Amino acid sequence: VKIWRFVHDELFTSIDVQLLQTITLSPKYFPLILALAQLDAESMVLAVAGTRPTIQIFVSRDTQFQLSATLSGHEGWIRALDFTRETSDPDSDLLLASASQDKYIRLWRFHQGNELPVVSSALNDPALGGLVKSLSNKAHWIESTTSKHSITFEALLLGHEDWIYTASWRHRDGKLQLLSTSEDNSLAFWESDPASGVWVCITRLGEISAQKGSTSATGSAGGFWIGLWSPDGNSVVSLGRTGSWRKWTYSSAEDMWAQQVAITGHVREVRGVTWSRDGSYLLSTSSDQTTRLFSQWRREGHASSWHEFSRPQIHGYDLNCVDAISDTEFVSGADEKLLRVFDEPKGVAEMLSKLCDIKASNTTDLPDAANIPVLGLSNKAIQAVGDEEEVENGEDDEREAVDPASIIRKSALEFTHPPFEDHLARHLLWPETEKLYGHGYEISAVAVSRDGGIVATACRASSVDHAVIRLYDTKEWLEVKPALKAHSLTVTSLQFSPDDKYLLSVGRDRQWVVWERSTEPSMYVLKHANPKGHSRMILNCAWTHFEQPTFLTAGRDKSVKIWQIVESEVHLKGIVTANAAVTAVASSAKVFDGKTWFAFGTETGEIGIATANAEGLDKVTVTTISAKISPAKTINQIVWRPGRTDEQKQQIAVATEDSSVRVYTVADDSA
């Protein structure tokens, strides 16, 4: 544990940080939480806890902290500590809350003076039962430079059913309240009963943990990890495993806490991103094993805002790539040997129409929603049931058995705002309609032809036999044979040309290959290949929309190369150098005055917007997006938003290793 001090002048024009002390913990353990408070006018008190069931109390004397007491009682790792004054009086007793993996919260009283405080009546709580005998009320004495203090056990708070991650004090409406969050998917408020002095849970928010069937005992790491008060104390937020913030705001008129729209997002690397064919919404896939749909909430009198509106796929494998087949259908690939195709359900289509002004096609034949059977990975189409209807479970075949918690009522699909996490995790899956088999290893790339008729796929490979590209016809969902064989290592990216005449593939073998459509509409044959397209592996590729077929390749050799097909040959027309390995590249569909834009991203998170002229591809102008709004890690994919009119500014969606999906607006300042 290191103690630091800020050093600054009177006007704060220069600020420095000075190391005061390094505390070596004994016995050794990993400190997980610290709490610091003013003990008296001269001294500070520091509480340290972690991977041992004890709390160490350090008191400062002449800027140096010394171990003064060790508080025992917990039976598991301690995850949270927080100090507060009992009342608004600065001389009132100091209270310390400690929360542990033993499912309990303990309160400790720091009392100034040589006499002990009155024994807390909270220990007379009948809910404690047989625990009372095991509760020690031993007094610990600590001294500062000017005063003496006692530390006594004040209360034991029971109510959570799993590990507790947060304990946070707040003086609210003249009352002292404690906020706690737990692995049991709940957030609780605690308050001392004015009559008996017993600490009771006055409000509980969140979910019923049993519905999820996961606890810390089964290896789950779910629940609510963080709980925070708003500055005015009338709102609280919590963050959990799925990456969603949950927000509740207190309504004095209704005397209840109401859930509000909050921020959601991926929690691990985002590997793939694609727009719907009309650009109305965005799909992203991640190694957090989810595919998520983002769109703009459009309201009269309010600016449009981006939100997660559906979680089409919640999988058991890390997801690697995704592409849209139509406005209501997409295909995704994961760390498994097959690809899965999903169709939009009626519930999602109607919600997007209502909240995002996305015109829905005929929804009468669509299923209402989807759910996952207890022992399955595939989303099954289901019909929502009325609020009063009883549901029969599939008793004859346990593989078709449905978790009662996943039953979807019609009222659960009626939204007036973007869905909360509870709905995203259960009610807004998309039914899986097809599986595409053929590959022998994990899927690495997928691309859909511009007309939506062909899906091209590739998998991880270390030999020519496995580094093939497989094509599937979207009408019959059958593989178009033979597979395309040219690469010797993993194919990292696939792209169809704007007219579907060509298919471009690039790979870790440093090779790019152009395949040409043959007389049979679904067949492609090798037309051009360059086994040394880059000096290091090629990580991404893209076609431009110039009249002359022109494509881009991005390599680990820190360059983007511009190639053009002229008659029967491919010529290198230009090279754009970058400051790091280029991991993503994409070209705008908009061509103006013979010029177009393309964007590229690097493994350091840098994004460049380049302007290229069809007549001078060797002279490319590059503008770098400010580091302040750039991702912190590798750019995995960039996609330009389709369907933008001339009056609308162009936009790009960026998938990054830092778990973010970002949308940037690209404007031409010279216009």
Which residues are covered by each model-predicted region?
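Terminal intrinsically disordered, low-complexity extensions flanking WD-repeat/beta-propeller proteins
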Residues: 104-106, 111-158, 186, 198-223, ...
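Canonical WD40 repeat/beta-propeller blade segments in eukaryotic WD-repeat proteins
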Residues: 26-39, 76-88, 161-171, 212-231, ...
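Alpha-solenoid helical-repeat scaffolds
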Residues: 413-501, 506-508, 513-516
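Conserved strand-to-loop turn within each blade of WD40 beta-propeller repeats
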Residues: 48-52, 98-104, 110, 181-186, ...
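A short beta-strand motif characteristic of beta-propeller blades
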Residues: 20-24, 67-70, 154-156, 212-216, ...
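WD40-repeat beta-propellers
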Residues: 1-6, 55-60, 81, 105-110, ...
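Structural hallmark of WD40 beta-propellers
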Residues: 41-47, 88-97, 174-179, 188-189, ...
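Repeat-solenoid scaffold signature
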Residues: 85-89, 161-181, 270-355
